[in-house]
């Protein structure tokens, strides 16, 4: 499981940072990539990675400001250029209005998309758990931006314990159907009368990962709720220390407020994202150091950076 940041800037493209988009790579888990936001130029950024467009099966939009959605019609159109046998359907999750925006853009431009797009739109009344599969759950809450904006919490379900095959062989259990029964938690009796207890040969379930992605927002309790005990918290950091007033006026957060959220939520790691173009390399390093005075395990991410979860 990995995160790759396709765009880490705020508002408009800059020389060092493209606008918002990140990919959650779940290739080992479900052979899919989930994308969060799709700002202008996202498909160009994807060309700099190993991500295959057909693997992107779900797109989660935080809100409808242009720096988070202007790349979506182009990406969807280009995705249709795959060979016919590689076409895969796509789900798009986001605020009410995302369906109209996408379909209107495709219609006006004459784009022909040969795969199915399934839209899932949300407002205040439909938040909470918005998606569930056999391996993952996704939750959404409203944040505190200048327009309706959602934060996402991706929860991997606990992984089953693994079977200790070597210990079973050492115990004289013949390889075959009995292994399957024991793996399913079933006790078995051997021909010599010995009872093999499944729990003695299966490791404890492994807790799944939690990834929280916070879109544009002022400091809010909803962010703490979404980030509770998260393995990774991706939080916007449009402004720096001392910029609290301007951040609030524009519906954004500072690096220090992001660190406070991570601390209050008990997150394990904080990745600062969505950085104003006025902050250059030295400034970003200082923002990281300042945030570390509140939450130690913090990093300011860069475009195309990969983070293993």
Swiss-Prot record:
Q: Which GO terms describe its molecular function?
A: 3'-tRNA processing endoribonuclease activity; zinc ion binding
Going by the UniProt record, its keywords in alphabetical order are: Endonuclease, Hydrolase, Metal-binding, Nuclease, tRNA processing, Zinc
**Catalytic machinery residues:** 67 (proton acceptor)
EC id? 3.1.26.11
Briefly state the protein's biological role: Zinc phosphodiesterase, which displays some tRNA 3'-processing endonuclease activity. Probably involved in tRNA maturation, by removing a 3'-trailer from precursor tRNA.
**PANTHER family membership:** ZINC PHOSPHODIESTERASE ELAC PROTEIN 1
Q: What is this protein called?
A: Ribonuclease Z
Organism classification, top ranks?
A: Bacteria, Bacillati, Bacillota, Bacilli, Lactobacillales
């Amino acid at each position: 499981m990995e995160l790759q940041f396709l765009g880490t800037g705020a508002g408009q493209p800059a020389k060092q940072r493209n606008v918002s988009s990140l990919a959650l790579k779940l290739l080992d888990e479900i052979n899919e990539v989930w994308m969060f936001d799709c700002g202008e130029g996202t498909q160009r950024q994807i060309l700099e990675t190993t991500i295959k467009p057909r693997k992107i099966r779900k797109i989660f939009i935080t809100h409808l400001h242009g720096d988070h959605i202007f790349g979506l019609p182009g990406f969807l159109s280009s995705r249709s250029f795959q060979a016919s046998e590689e076409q895969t359907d796509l789900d798009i999750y986001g605020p009410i209005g995302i369906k109209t925006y996408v379909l209107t853009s495709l219609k006006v431009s004459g784009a022909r998309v040969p795969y199915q797009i399934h839209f899932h739109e949300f407002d205040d009344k439909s938040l909470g758990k918005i998606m569930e599969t056999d391996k993952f759950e996704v939750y959404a809450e409203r944040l505190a931006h200048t327009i309706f904006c959602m934060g996402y919490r991706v929860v991997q379900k606990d992984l089953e314990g693994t079977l200790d095959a070597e210990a079973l062989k050492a115990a004289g259990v013949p390889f075959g159907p009995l292994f399957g029964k024991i793996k399913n938690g079933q006790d078995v009796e051997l021909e010599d009368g010995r009872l093999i207890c499944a729990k003695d040969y299966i490791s404890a379930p492994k807790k799944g990962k939690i990834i929280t992605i916070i879109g544009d927002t002022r400091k809010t309790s909803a962010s703490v709720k979404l980030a509770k005990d998260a393995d990774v918290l991706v939080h916007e950091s449009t402004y720096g220390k001392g910029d609290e007033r301007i951040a609030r006026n524009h519906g954004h957060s500072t690096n220090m407020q992001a660190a406070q959220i991570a601390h209050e939520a008990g997150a394990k790691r904080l990745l600062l994202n969505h950085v104003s173009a006025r902050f250059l390399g030295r400034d970003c390093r200082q923002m990281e150091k300042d945030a570390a005075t509140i939450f130690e395990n913090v990093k300011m991410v860069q475009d195309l950076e990969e983070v293993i979860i």
